Amino acid sequence: SACLVGSEMCIRDRNRKKSQVARAWKCDYLGYGMSWHQQPRLRVARMSLDRLRDRLRMLLRSVRARKMATVIERINPVLRGWASYFKLSQSKRPLEELDGWVRHKLRCVIWRQWKQPPTRLRNLMRLGLSEERANKSAFNGRGPWWNSGAQHMNYALPKKLWDRLGLVSILDTINRLSRVT
């Protein structure tokens, strides 16, 4: 029947895209890839990292008026599940970068929540910046993404604070899981 022929062609095309003859380090399988070293190591595929970033962007899109504890509760299951799936990964740098990107994104949410420069000044001073440095930072006129990656926000909202708030660190979770297994 025509329906069977159409579905057969769809399956054949899809499998052709997935199937290939190539070196192990040039193709990815189930979200993992391999390094090109003599002793190959498992790594997280670039596409998997991009898909996680897209998923987190979608989750963080509508959190501007929420408490940070609620935001962290919302993204933690995704981060924890992703870390447990990729616990076999042996590459450290992409996971460090991903953790940094998540914190950068959350600092961006906070910067947007503060909205006005006087509020930013008051909150930066409350978080430990000197008045002069907080004033320069709050009134610098740059955008939220730039400010969330700047030194003043890293100083005001360090990794220790995110750990205290309960944010799941992918690298720390993978290290903990690899010690257990």
How does the language model describe each region?
Residues 1, 18-21, 44, 90, ...:
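Residue-level detector of intrinsically disordered, flexible termini
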Residues 1-6, 10-11:
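Single conserved hydrophobic/aromatic residue that forms the stacking wall/gate
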Residues 7-8, 38, 83, 87-88:
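Catalytic palm subdomain of template-directed nucleic-acid polymerases
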Residues 12-74, 78-81:
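A conserved non-catalytic segment of reverse transcriptases
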Residues 67, 71-117, 121-125:
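Non-catalytic, peripheral interaction segments enriched in hydrophobic/basic residues
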Residues 104-105, 110, 114-181:
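Extended C-terminal regions of large enzymes
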